[in-house]
Amino acid sequence: MAYCNSKTDLSRVPLLALNMGFRKKVGLYLNPRNAVAADWMALAEALGFTFLEIKNYESAINPTVKVLEDWQARSTDATVGKLLSILSEVERNDVLEDLQPMIDEDVRRYCERLNRDPEPPVQVNQVDSCFHRTLERVGLTLHDDPEGTPELFDAFICYCQRDFEFVQEMIRQLEETDFKLKLCVFDRDVLPGSCVWTITSELIEKRCKRMVVVISDEYLDSEACDFQTKFALSLSPGARNKRLIPVKYKSMSKPFPSILRFLTLCDYTRPCTQAWFWKRLAKALSLP
């Protein structure tokens, strides 16, 4: 989409164009249980969520926001146009009428960003072979050649500092064995001095084939991990290319992140499957 105007096809505008302000506002309309008008449960059902999934959303602080977030992550057709169509189907035209100015403004801003940066994220199941060599993206990692091909990796490891001991074990098991995989570990491989968000998005999108997410209670409190996970999911909606692999290595007291529930988990906490854990993970990371 080169530009946007009043005739913009909203079925081609991804849901991520709608900012948090709009999503919270929709929640004010849909979160209250309503015996007459359709609420967030009706929206979730229309979006394709199962009964058990909808029951789990009842514990969310803002279930409407959570439903939209998960729909965006799991569906290939999560667009502004689709959302508006479903709100119309469940007869919540009041929401459409009241929030139309916010929708128009969010779409306008999204299109302006596209005009400034005409290269949207490449949603493919392999590392992008076309590198935009700006100064900000040269010499990011320890073994980068500023004059040659950037350093590439089999997987980006998403983790918080409290889980670094397990990341070190992952390095030993996957890099220093016959698997000979190449992992991108931020604290080890990334050079200091550049914008964290720019480096992270560059590495996940263009340098790494996949991303391993180390899930723990501490992970749930990490803003960096939250950004990395959602960015990786946006590159692979619906997990159609197995780009993101969640790993659980210790028991958790908090609920497993709902945004990752639809992905197959590599679970190190189950004694009966630990013998196969590293082989399964290595195989998943070795796929084309």
UniProtKB/Swiss-Prot annotation:
GO terms for cellular component: cytoplasm; plasma membrane. InterPro entries: DEATH-like_dom_sf, Death_dom, MyD88_Death, Myelin_different_resp_MyD88, TIR_dom, Toll_tir_struct_dom_sf. This is Myeloid differentiation primary response protein MyD88. The keyword Protein biosynthesis does not apply. GO terms for molecular function: TIR domain binding; Toll-like receptor binding. Residues 25-103 form the Death domain. Adapter protein involved in the Toll-like receptor and IL-1 receptor signaling pathway in the innate immune response. PROSITE patterns: DEATH_DOMAIN, TIR. SMART domains: DEATH, TIR. Keywords: Cytoplasm, Immunity, Inflammatory response, Innate immunity. It comes from the Eukaryota.
